[in-house]
From Swiss-Prot:
Gene that specifies this protein: ligA
Catalysed reaction equations from the record: NAD(+) + (deoxyribonucleotide)n-3'-hydroxyl + 5'-phospho-(deoxyribonucleotide)m = (deoxyribonucleotide)n+m + AMP + beta-nicotinamide D-nucleotide
Highest rank taxon of the organism: Bacteria
Name under which the protein is recorded: DNA ligase
Entry-linked PROSITE patterns: BRCT, DNA_LIGASE_N1, DNA_LIGASE_N2
Record-level GO BP terms: DNA repair; DNA replication
Catalytic residues of the enzyme: 150
């Protein structure tokens, strides 16, 4: 749906007797008929644009919206006097400008104080300051606070006069900003006319109780009542870009760059992309950028007696058709502030957009007035940040790491910088193409990002700070002289792939070490005590060259190593012996076949039932396995076509690695497993079963465990502290099980493998 024609919304509403005067009409309508029809079309299109952009609940098919939109365009072309500033046809218009007009804010756009303490004590300190300023005794009730997110975007002031958007301006220096009205009109979430209704009128006492729903305007005339809307209402908020929209935008930019389009570039982060779009001189370009908006406050107001609380004010703005973030709350005292800060901190990485903190505001507008301002900052509000997820630092060098499969990864060596709650000195550059695309050079000032548990990465270069003596553009092949930095083998870049690889295989010590660590990992052979430091010793000392040699280790060989005591050696030998009894799926996963992860290994084991059948399967036979495509099938076939790999497999079997016969399921049997074809999602903490144990039980019964909830999900298994997955399951009306319900499902399914999963109404179900 384009910003100029938001093409998604609902069955053609009741026309309220207004005749259709669109292009299909036999004769041009008179002015009075056209005016009535145009008013109805504006109202209807605004209503459905609100459903689509703000409520994410479209009702009108795209084609029907487009038909109504085109009819309005035709009327306005026929009678230009009927073209109003709030018409949906006016979202994208105007000429390319030479520059922006500076406008003065009627009420300054002041910034709020930032709490430098990012811990819980920062919230406690703010509450203590407010209570002190209000001279409250220690036994006074806790203060009510409105808590919100601190969006990482561009602050904007929207000026509505009698309910119609007439101007949009940036914050600028707080006193004056730039007029960006034409660009802001392209943002579908921002209403060109407010949905004002009598209950939002100037009489403060006519407002419904806080928390009640405000009455909304309805289609069938102009939305709301323009004569009831405030004479002036300035709405402050943030223009931002969602993460998924940002990724899609950058993907389009990369395609344009690949085509050779001049002047195109990718964007470093969503904030820069949003700010750049708002300040585009050509509104047609701004319209192509996927921008969003959240309202969070007011500027100048004339003709509206405000609600008594900040939360009530935001409710009113939402009822008037403005997008207001749902992640907000009214909390009590310091404890409430701390809880909100911690809750949002846990959600931060899963939000659809970037934030850099939360905002606390005294909820009572009367108390806000009492507290006032100090040095142009409100005493009644504060921004409480989280540790920054992006920081700037200097690139000291680029090293090349060799992975388990021979992949060569460029790694940035950085001046240490505190980002994402930890000190970072290394960050991935992913591959040569990414390093070149970002034009990363030694000596550059770079932007490093670390969010949650994500590996730190260099996301861009600050070109304005590039020194004159900066290094050359990165060329991996030239840098290495075409040879692996560990073993000296030739490197190659397979056609169609982004990664260079060492061709040395297990001859390469780096690949050998990574292959051993992979083989010994918990979800593979689970050899307890075989960690990276010990593997380094074993490989560097020449004790281990191949995987089968692990099972020739004895206490004497191990105790000969530095810092290896007899007890540790005995424990490791016992762990090696224990690992010999495994499953076919674990064994396949442990071999480190490219493209074969845990799920694929389990699918292969279920489908073929025996290792020899997997090793001898053709590419076509492999593609018959669920979720195995041509690339994965070719990778498996290539692995087992190598004599060395077959020899390793036979030596491991000869060393005593085995799996129980009953675990081998022929392809025909796989389809008859009790949960075959069923998809389950695990969320939260189960009382007795660990996540891995629950996953194993489900997969052993033929079910598939997915990481996300969708309409294709059959069951959601929810434990304590289940989050957004449980909420989505409820929205979709899916069957929700607790641990007891899961076990009952497995038992009942096993007793009757032909039972339809939806025919199990007696299974214990978690409360919804």
């Amino acid at each position: 749906m384009s910003p100029s024609a938001p093409a998604n919304s609902a069955p053609d509403p009741d026309r309220n007797g207004v005749p259709d005067v669109g292009p299909a009409s036999a004769a041009p309508p008179d002015l009075q008929t056209a005016a009535a029809r145009a008013a109805w079309l504006r109202s209807t299109l605004q209503h459905h644009a609100h459903l689509y952009y703000v409520l994410d609940a479209p009702e009108l098919p795209d084609a029907e919206y487009d038909r109504l939109f085109q009819e309005l365009q035709a009327i306005e072309a026929m009678y230009p006097a009927l073209r109003t500033a709030d018409s949906p046809t006016q979202r994208v218009l105007g000429q390319v400008r030479d520059g922006f007009v500076v406008v003065r804010h009627a009420v300054p756009m002041l910034s709020i104080r930032t709490e430098t303490d990012t811990e819980a004590s920062g919230a406690v300190a703010f509450d203590a300051r407010v209570r002190r300023e209000l001279e409250l005794p220690d036994d006074a009730p806790p203060i009510s606070y409105a808590t919100e997110l601190k969006f990482d975007g561009l602050a904007i002031n929207l000026r509505y006069e009698h309910g119609v958007l007439v101007q949009a301006a940036t914050r600028g220096d707080g006193e004056s900003g730039e007029d960006v009205t034409q660009n802001i009109r392209t943002i579908g979430q921002i209403p060109l006319r407010l949905r004002w209704a009598p209950t939002l009128g100037a009489d403060a006492h006519s407002l419904p109780p806080e928390g009640a729903r405000f009455a909304l305007g309805r289609p069938g005339g102009e939305t709301g009542a323009p004569d009831l809307a405030p004479a002036v209402l300035e709405v402050r908020g943030e223009v931002y870009m969602r993460r998924d929209d940002f990724e899609a935008l950058n993907e389009r930019q990369r395609e344009r760059i690949a085509r050779g389009d001049k002047g195109e570039k990718t964007f470093v982060n969503p904030r820069n992309a949003a700010a750049g779009a708002v300040r585009q001189l050509d509104p047609a370009i701004a319209a192509q950028r996927p921008l969003s908006f959240f309202a969070y406050g007011l500027g100048e107001v004339q003709g509206w007696a405000l609600p008594h609380t900040h939360a009530g004010l935001l409710d009113a703005l939402a009822a008037a058709g403005l997008p207001v973030c749902a992640e907000r709350a009214v909390v009590q005292g310091a404890d409430g502030l701390v809880a909100f800060h911690q809750r949002i901190g846990a959600l931060r990485d899963s939000l659809a957009f970037d934030i850099d903190g939360v905002v606390y505001k005294v909820d009572s507008l009367a108390l806000q007035q009492r507290l006032g301002f100090v040095t142009r900052e409100p005493r009644w509000a504060v921004a409480h940040k989280y540790p920054a997820q992006e920081q700037m630092t200097r690139l000291l060098g680029i090293e090349i790491q060799v992975g388990r499969t021979g992949k060569l990864t460029p790694v940035a060596r950085l001046e240490p910088v505190f980002v994402g709650g930890t000190t970072v000195s290394n960050a991935t550059l992913h591959n040569e193409d990414e390093a070149r695309r970002k034009d990363v050079r030694v000596g550059d000032t770079v932007i490093v990002r670390r969010a949650g548990d994500v590996i730190p990465q260099v996301v861009g270069v600050v070109l304005e700070q590039r020194p004159d003596d900066v290094g050359e553009p990165f060329d991996l092949y030239q840098r290495l002289g075409g040879r692996c930095p560990v073993c000296g083998s030739a490197i190659a870049r397979p056609e169609g792939e982004a990664d260079w690889r060492c061709t040395g295989g297990l001859f390469c010590a780096a690949q050998r070490k990574q292959a051993i660590l992979h083989f010994a990992s918990r979800r593979m052979m689970d050899i307890e005590g075989l960690g990276d430091k010990l593997v380094d010793q074993l490989v560097d000392a020449g004790v281990i060259r191949t995987l089968p040699e692990l099972y020739k280790l004895g206490v004497a060989k191990l105790t000969a190593l530095e810092r290896m005591g007899e007890k540790s050696a005995v424990n490791l030998v016992a762990a090696l012996e224990k690992s010999k009894q495994t499953t076919l799926a674990r064994f396949l996963f442990s071999l480190g076949i490219r493209q074969v992860g845990e799920a694929t290994a389990k699918a292969l084991a279920r489908h073929f039932g025996a290792l020899d059948r997997v090793m001898d399967a053709s590419v076509d036979q492999l593609q018959a396995v669920p979720d195995v495509g041509p690339i994965v099938a070719l990778s498996i076939r290539t692995f087992f076509d190598q004599p060395h790999n077959r020899e390793v497999v036979e030596q491991l079997r000869a060393a005593g690695i085995h799996w129980a016969e009953h675990e081998a399921s022929a392809a025909a049997d796989a389809a008859e497993l009790p949960l075959a074809g069923k998809t389950l999602v695990l969320t939260g903490t189960l009382p007795t079963l660990g996540r891995d144990a629950a996953k194993d039980l489900i997969e052993a019964a033929g079910g598939k465990v997915s990481g996300s909830v969708s309409k294709k999900t059959h069951f959601v298994v929810a434990g304590a502290e289940a989050g957004s997955k449980l909420d989505k399951a409820r929205e979709l009306g899916l069957v929700i099980l607790d641990e007891a319900g899961l076990l009952a499902l497995l038992n009942e399914a096993e007793a009757d493998a032909d039972a339809d999963a939806e025919g199990l109404p007696d299974s214990p179900v978690a409360p919804t």
